[in-house]
Amino acid sequence: SYKVSGGLHGVGVSVVNALSKKLHLTIHRAGQIHEQEYAHGDPQYPLKVVGETDTSGTTVRFWPSELTFSQTIFSVDILARRLRELSFLNAGVRIVLRDERVNLEHIYDYEVGLSEKSALDIAGLPGKLADCQEKDPALSELYLVEGDSAGGSAKQGRNRKMQAILPLKGKILNVERARFDKMISSQEVGTLITALGCGIGREEYNPDKLRYHKII
């Protein structure tokens, strides 16, 4: 898998390579340092050994192509949000973002991450949420019910136009007394956060994005 995996679905580095005017790889593996360089997706020379090492890891450097992108300056805010999401999903992985243009550094290091099925996953709304048809939050209601059986009854009796139903498993975590890492690892808390839509934390929380103005 090491030889064929290039990231998510095995295409990550391949796509970056194709969209870059230059991409340089430095790989520390099995006691050797390997290097290779590409220009607009084409290898400039075969993978070669340039030294010895007692560490492991890969450094990828790339320069976006002006032929493809009209804007090649990276947005630190976008990168910071994405890396923060990745740090939640990958417990124990330390991610460092440095912007050397302004001497800025962000460090993301969560001891307890989130599973891929957690509701903080960016995939979309929780699967058990029976959403309403109304798109205006001021006219939308969210009903929180305990258990799938109660959720089924509530879904049958609701007004589909304006009433959404979200079944939750059992008693939800008391977040007022819980540590932050325990809170975000709770599947039910994550489900609720995603359904409400306004995010969490000082950087991400935005009450204007609340999807329902009435929560019962």
From Swiss-Prot:
Its EC number is 5.6.2.2. It catalyses: ATP-dependent breakage, passage and rejoining of double-stranded DNA. Heterotetramer, composed of two GyrA and two GyrB chains. In the heterotetramer, GyrA contains the active site tyrosine that forms a transient covalent intermediate with DNA, while GyrB binds cofactors and catalyzes ATP hydrolysis. Gene3D superfamilies: 3.40.50.670, Histidine kinase-like ATPase, C-terminal domain. This is DNA gyrase subunit B. Belongs to the type II topoisomerase GyrB family. GO terms for cellular component: cytoplasm. GO terms for biological process: DNA topological change. SMART domains: TOP2c (SM00433). It is found in: Cytoplasm. It is an enzyme of class 5 (isomerase). One of its GO terms (molecular function) is DNA binding. Pfam families: Toprim. A type II topoisomerase that negatively supercoils closed circular double-stranded (ds) DNA in an ATP-dependent manner to modulate DNA topology and maintain chromosomes in an underwound state. Negative supercoiling favors strand separation, and DNA replication, transcription, recombination and repair, all of which involve strand separation. Also able to catalyze the interconversion of other topological isomers of dsDNA rings, including catenanes and knotted rings. Type II topoisomerases break and join 2 DNA strands simultaneously in an ATP-dependent manner. Residues 140-216 form the Toprim domain. PANTHER family: DNA GYRASE SUBUNIT B, MITOCHONDRIAL, DNA GYRASE/TOPOISOMERASE SUBUNIT B. The record marks K171, N174 as: Interaction with DNA. Keywords: ATP-binding, Cytoplasm, DNA-binding, Isomerase, Nucleotide-binding, Topoisomerase. Few gyrases are as efficient as E.coli at forming negative supercoils. Not all organisms have 2 type II topoisomerases; in organisms with a single type II topoisomerase this enzyme also has to decatenate newly replicated chromosomes.
